[in-house]
Amino acid sequence: MTKTLSCGAVIYRKIQGRILFLILKHTNGNHWSLAKGHTEFGESEIQTAVREIDEETGLRVKFKPGFREAIRYSPSPGVEKTVVFFLAKARGKKLTLQRSEISNGIWVELEDSLKLISHKDTAEVLRRAQAYLIQE
C-alpha cells in the first residue's frame, strides 16, 4: 500500500460578524475543495500548508492553534491518502490564484460552501472549523 500525505487549511475571514470560507475550484477533477497539496521532502505539515496556501492563493495567513483535522481515503487501488487541514485566518482578501491548478476561488458562508464542496469529508472539516470559530 502506497501512502501519501497532503496538507492545507480551512482559510477564513470575518466580516460584519459573518464567517466566510475560501473554497477553490481545482482544475484537476474540476471540483471544489480547500487549499492543499502534497508534502515535499523534509517539510513539516505546517510548512506544507503555508507553501500550498501561498502557491494556490497568494494569501498570507495566521494559523489558529489547536485545530488540526485529518481525513483519509483511497483515491485509487493500493493508495491511501491522508489530508491534514489546519485553520487559518486570511491576512487580506486579494487572491492571486495559481491558474495551472485553480480555476476559481470564492469567499462563502458555511451553508453555501457545503453546496459546492465535492467531498463529504471535506465538508465535515468545514463544519468543525465553523464550530471551532463559534466557540472562541
Predicted regions and their residues:
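Short polar/acidic secondary-structure junctions
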Residues: K14-Q16, H26, S76
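NUDIX/MutT-family hydrolases
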Residues: T96-A129
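Conserved Nudix-box catalytic region and its N-terminal flanking loop in Nudix hydrolases
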Residues: R18-R60
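Short, well-ordered beta-strand micro-motif
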Residues: I11, I23, L87-K89
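Short helix-loop capping/hinge motifs at secondary-structure junctions, enriched
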Residues: G17-R18, K93-T96
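Active-site segment of metal-dependent pyrophosphate-handling enzymes
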Residues: G58-K94
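Conserved N-terminal beta-strand and adjoining loop/helix that marks the start
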Residues: M1-L20
